[in-house]
Amino acid sequence: MFQKILTILFGSKYERDLKRLNPIVETINSFEVTIKAMDDETLSSQTKKFKERLASGETLDDILPEAFATVREVAYRTLGMRHFDVQMMGGISLHWGNISEMKTGEGKTLTSTLPIYLNSLSGEGVHVVTVNDYLAKRDANWMRPVFEFLKVSVGVIQHDMDHEERKVAYNSDITYGTNNEFGFDYLRDNMVSYKEHRVQRQHNFAIVDEVDSILIDEARTPLIISGPAEESTDKYLKVNKIIPKLVEGEDFEIDEKAKNVILSEAGVHHVEKLLEVDNLYHAENIELVHHVQQALKAHKIFFKDKDYVVQDGEVIIVDEFTGRLMKGRRYSDGLHQSLEAKEGVPIARESQTLASITFQNYFRIYKKLAGMTGTADTEAEEFKKIYNLDVIVIPSNLKIQRQDMPDRVYKTEREKFDAVVKDIQEKVSRKQPVLVGTISIEKSEVLSKLLFSHGIQHNVLNAKQHERESEIVANAGKPGAITIATNMAGRGTDIVLGGAPKYKDDLEKLDDKCDSLGIKNKEELEIIYSFRECLIKQKFDEAEGKISDVRNETIKKECIKILGDAKKWKVDHDFVIGAGGLHIIGSERHESRRIDNQLRGRSGRQGDPGSSRFYLSLQDDLMRIFGSDRIARIMDTLKMPEGQELEHSMVSNAIARAQKRVEGHNFDIRKHLLEYDDVMNRQRIYIYGIRNELLDKGNMSKTVFDFFDEVVENQVILYCEGNNADAWEIDSLNEWLQSLGIDHKIESKDFKKESNPQLKVFEVVSKLVKELYDYKVSSIGDEIWRSIERNVFLDILDHRWKEHLYAMDHLKEGIWTVGYGEKNPLIEYKLQGFKMFDQLVDNLKNEVVSFLLKIEVTESDKKQDDTSPKEYKKIGQEQRAEVDMFGNELKSNKTKPQVSSTTSSGGGSERRSSRRKK
């Protein structure tokens, strides 16, 4: 209601956003003439000037217009690219800490240079987050000339970098990297033994590219660093043998919507007989029930060449959202081991958590967060509720010309694919490029075989062609190119009509060639620069005229070649535009409307023509699982002949309703995961706070003295309750003191005359404890003691935290059972988790106090100076683990270093990565 009133009075949100942005863009444009007149040296010195203004009290908002105008001019001089006004809007929105929704081809990477540069001026660092290493490196190198011209340093994090290389990258003003690398480096930084071994600085400002992919699609995959658990793998083989003997409908039912398998009462008895156990649900068999459940899912819910593939003796997960092979990623909770048993490959061991965090809680650490994507508006509610991010829709620079045609629905999958082939044949006849989106490797290969049988040449882009991904996508706009891609594989690489304009890459290399040939003549360099400008603006005749003035023969030949390539590309580009642009075929609807919109958005970039159509069948997963019975009955009633499609608003509405239901369900899962992780997050913040204080200060004597007071107080309350000294358990208190190495004997009679006996005994015991502590310090020496104290504290803290994480994992796995007792699992998890954490803190204090007071140091220990940082060592293995409604996640399963993740369809998937090189 409030939104309706707001719209009536002040216009739609989109209109209100534009009203805020337009005046700032006008101010930016007012600087253009002045800045354009600056020579390179003056323009480059703008950074120094801006930093001085910030130091004098101005804010980033104050200098935004001039800073943005500066970046625009530098980008034009270094890259030959000038920011459009709509890109300025996108940049302002990002600086404000919003999500800028910009359609495919609108130049998000160039747009990001504006807020990246502005926020780098604070000196606190900017993190630019991408979905993979290739894009991180590509974008950093692409935009590097802009930043380096302005004397701003750029670093890139790559998966195989060692510790020192990472440190250098993070100390740069701007750091590009993937969400996984940023997250894992954060966890590793909270596991180091010396502050010098940390790689990250503070978390100041992050811009997340493809923000919907990272903050929505991957939000169910916590980052986990784990170590191996001691557990046999035989049980997986034992359970796997009995699954083929169970009968669907009698022993179990399959719930495709929930991606679950439910064991019937008859099935329970059958399993008991096969496994030779008396009672499957006896306490000692709870783990066995879990393994049976996971084995059933492995056989009945997860399918080879759809959910995973088997390569080189390994089960490798196929990413649900991109169709890529996720090498090293593992399903969690024993599901991956069950799949390994099913496929007859070696079974890896399970593991336990050493450190973990969800993407939701990692990215909420940043002081300011922003994101870019072509499709965010459908998830605006989730971005606001979870991340407090507003979505601002940025207008396109040119009007979108793409025609989105109605869906065509067929009764069977065979009829649907026949129709897809006919559509492709029709486009092939006029050499119009086609991109076909499929939801799995299996479907892409079925369609590929069908096209080959009709003699249609094409490229297939799925996990098996991962290495050629960018090349295939870049050339998907060539005349007559037919490309089949799983989901959104290749996202981040624009499909340019006419194919990739490679001549632009060669053009960029001209400067380097001139340098290598020693060309320094100013007049000749200006001619080459003019040639470059003409080519960028596609003024080919003028460019040809410039070539004749080039004196160096090597450069002249290179210019002739580049011009020839540019002309050929222009012919292809114009031909494809005349043929109707890129045609998109969706071979199935995805669960999320956003993923469908991403596929459509590959066509019609920057005002180009294009078209799209989805082909569906009643056998598609979305239609089959979420209710296509009514549509099927109508098709039967109408006696529709084979091959006849159905186009009706009722069909479109049914699909939209199904997608909204699934989106709502997935949002609930992500929200639920966050509610569970918030419990751990509060605990994590407390432990990491103590840890960082320990590393940064080194001297923990004040904290230790606080621990003394709390531990002594607890012991006094335990053994000396109330002020009646005769009722005290004074012998127990003395035994505790003796266990610490304090021989002083306390007598209850000494306190009877005190007005507050309990307070007095606390003071006496506290004094005894601190005297022993002071004696230890003085006898060993302050410097050596501080080092010992720090190491003892750190060692105990890390061990207790690791044990606590293990216990919390088990609590999470078993908490669902309280639902049968009509209790709320989340509330029970919070209550029990708080009690366990409270116990952890008490144990930590007791153990630190006890260890420090009992410690004995030899002469050789005194001679060792342990204050200098040791060599950096990486601990544990990295994982990504998706979770179920109760947040159950991890259990990666290799003893060697790795990374993991899940689909909350029951198991979790885990993604592995190698250790940092030493």
From Swiss-Prot:
The coding gene here is: secA
State the residue spans of region: Disordered: 863-918
Q: Which reaction does it catalyse?
A: ATP + H2O + cellular proteinSide 1 = ADP + phosphate + cellular proteinSide 2
Q: Tell me where in or outside the cell this protein is found.
A: Cell inner membrane; Cytoplasm
Q: Name one GO cellular component term.
A: cytosol
Q: What is this protein called?
A: Protein translocase subunit SecA
Its EC number(s)? 7.4.2.8
Q: Which residues cross the membrane?
A: none
